[in-house]
Amino acid sequence: GHGRWIGQRELGLIRAALMPRVGESLLDVGCGTGFFTRALRPVIDGDIVGADIDAGWLAYARARDKMETLYERADARALPHADKAFDLVTAMTVIDFIDEDAAALAELVRVAKRRVAIGLLNRNSLLWWQKGRGVGRGGYRGARWYTPAEAIGLFDGLPVDNLRVDTAIVLPGGGRLARWMEGRWPSWLSVGAFLLVTADVIGS
């Protein structure tokens, strides 16, 4: 289906940006249904932990996961882990729904040893015009949308470098035209609805 194609496009971007090494561990913050947590298992051979504040989503994620994945209830703004506890830390379209976005991002960086990847909703996208304006529509209600520059600005003052921005899903919906357009749109325009920012933790 269309949703599956969109998820796979986003997943491809995340895998390429993380570039996992042998034995590395991963914390997926705001894992929700566990879609990305499960989907990253083939490229992560270390420990994987999915964290979410919603007990209902965690129960759903556990039921769907046949692997050795630990799911825990945790607040993104106060993660129950030591500094540099995980090699890789991800948070996919989570920061957009947290009021204290800077505090949550600082926590992600704190518990990361090598690399952090966050997925955000891109304000410079067709999807924002369709779903994001005003208070937002449907599942995007109350979400915060970021321009690529604002997304990079979230990392100001944090111990990271090598920041990189990628986007995917230029045309919403995932139909035939959207799939055709996806590979033909110049990536430097950064107009995809899904905005991925990757950063290396300094001192790793």
How does the language model describe each region?
Residues 27, 33-78:
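Class I SAM-dependent methyltransferase SAM/SAH-binding core
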Residues 142-165:
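Short alpha-helix
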